[in-house]
Amino acid sequence: MTMQTIVNGGARRNAERGASLLELALLLPILVVLVFGVIDLGRLIHARLVVTNVSREGGSLASRDIQTGANLITMLQSSATPFNLQTQGRIYVTKIKAGTSQSAPLPYILSRDSGGSYNVSSSIGGSVGAAPTGLSTTMYNHLRFEPAPQSAADIAEISVVEVFYHYRPITPLPNFVQNLFPVNGGILIGSRAIF
C-alpha cells in the first residue's frame, strides 16, 4: 500500500463524516419538530376525550339529580385530571323545564350553575326563568307545551352540561411555527351534552 492510497482513503472518510454531519444538521430540526408535534397532538387528543367524557358524565348525573349545583361542578372538575378545569376551564350546568300549560307553553331555564375561572360564555342564552336560546329547533319544540289531546310537552326537563378547556401545548412548538394556536397561545376545546 502506498502513501498516496492511505492519504486518499483518509480524505474520503473525512468527506463521508462531513456529509453525515451535514445530513444530521439538516434533519435534526425536522425530527425535533415532528417529535414535538406528536407530543402536543397526543395531549390535544387526550384533552378532547377528557372534556367530552366530563360533559357526558355531568349530563348523566345532572339529569338523574345525583349531584346538583356546586357539588356536581366540583366533582366534574376533579374528574378532569390531569387537566385543570378550575383555572383553565369552565363548566356550565343548565336545567331547562318544559312548558307546563297553554298559558305558559314555552320552556324556561329552571337553574344554571357554573364553575371555573376561564372567561367563556355558555351556548345556552337567557337567564333563570326566561326562555332559553341556543337549543336546536327540534329540541326546543319537544319542550313546548302541546294542547289537547296531548296536553303536555314531549319532554318534561333536560339538563345541559357544557365543558370548556383552554389547551396550551407543553412543547416549544408554537415558537417554531407561527400562528399555530390562535387563542392566547392555545386552543379552546368545548363539549356539550344534553340529557
Residue ranges and their predicted role:
Residues 3-6, 26-30, 55:
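Mobile, glycine-rich extracellular loop/lid and propeptide segments
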Residues 41, 45, 54-79:
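N-terminal alpha-helical signal peptides/signal-anchor transmembrane segments
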Residues 99-187:
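Intrinsically disordered, low-complexity regions enriched in Pro/Ser/Thr/Gly and acidic residues
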Residues 14-43:
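N-terminal single-pass transmembrane signal-anchor helix
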Residues 65-107:
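Extracytoplasmic beta-strand-rich oligomerization domains located immediately C-terminal to a leader/signal peptide
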Residues 90-95, 160-164, 190-194:
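Soluble periplasmic/extracytoplasmic beta-strand elements of cell-envelope proteins
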Residues 1-17:
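N-terminal leader/signal peptides at the extreme start of proteins
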